[in-house]
């Protein structure tokens, strides 16, 4: 297996121009495909997840052009639901941001489509979404294991009263919200359980509004969506920088700054993960906010005990930053780490112990006490881009770290390690 050893980093300083947000990129691509008119997306993320979405749109007959660096996409909308001529199988890798929204959107027309993916995708639950779509009339069959992909979709979604469990993944609600306006009837979506990752729903609603569709949000408990609507292209749309990707550079600055400035997001960003900067500030770093940047300057870091449900992806970065904080850090209400690219609670606990931390792994929390001195370790990444990026922070100690399968960052940030090196000074 390929590996990358990072030597100790004495200091970080500089500016990082963030790649486009994964969450925004794939939502914008799907809405542009469903919309009337031509949409030009700029600062699109070039990553595995986005390529899976683009490949699916190609197979569904959409036409688009990509710039050489794959960050500018002109796409001609279908002006309504996507339709496949004849039976079709779409392979979506491990891209949850493609699998969940497409599973819903492709139930609008009389299609016969199979959605499948990598082995890990077949372990990521989708039953709550399928149950909700079936309530709205969709005809969906599990081809292997009940409640998991692969799925066979045969249309039938017409709207109506739909319940969805919000406690595992906000992507199920996102998928329903983006699909419902194109259904022939009105849809009332009721949320069962506590809605996780609420800021990701705000991204969805924000993008739908950009494409001309507004819905009634009743305190995140119920959503009322008028049927028979259509999406309209906004013309040109700039994809925000990825706030989850910003977390690694901001944390590096908190630990070994200097000052690091990330551009492409700022105080008005629609992504909930910008709130990661508030957590660093609470730990002791200095944060400065601009309209299109956030900067972080080193501070003496202290442990925190916090509910991280609102920023589950960026919260992983706090778990490795905790290695540099004084005291024991507890991150709570993060059960949905277990249904991501890997079981992130198990993976994080396992790898933190390798570098010497004392770790308590609960059902939905993790407690981390740093060692006096970090151990050198080979970090397994579990084919999870965020594990690779989080554990790069270990090099901010006086100990090197080896990251196994470093190219797994291609899911959201193909040149992550080059960007980190650019702002790093060797010890």
UniProtKB/Swiss-Prot annotation:
Binding site for 3-phosphoshikimate: 22-23, 27, 169-171, 197, 313, 336, 340
UniProt EC number: 2.5.1.19
Record's catalysed reaction(s): 3-phosphoshikimate + phosphoenolpyruvate = 5-O-(1-carboxyvinyl)-3-phosphoshikimate + phosphate
Gene3D superfamilies for the chain: Enolpyruvate transferase domain
GO cellular component, one term: cytoplasm
Subcellular location: Cytoplasm
GO BP term (any one): amino acid biosynthetic process
Flavoprotein is among the record's keywords: no
Classification via Pfam families: EPSP_synthase
Chain residues that bind phosphoenolpyruvate: 22, 96, 124, 171, 344, 386, 411
UniProt family annotation: Belongs to the EPSP synthase family.
Function in brief: Catalyzes the transfer of the enolpyruvyl moiety of phosphoenolpyruvate (PEP) to the 5-hydroxyl of shikimate-3-phosphate (S3P) to produce enolpyruvyl shikimate-3-phosphate and inorganic phosphate.
Name of the protein described by the UniProt record: 3-phosphoshikimate 1-carboxyvinyltransferase
Organism of origin: Shigella flexneri
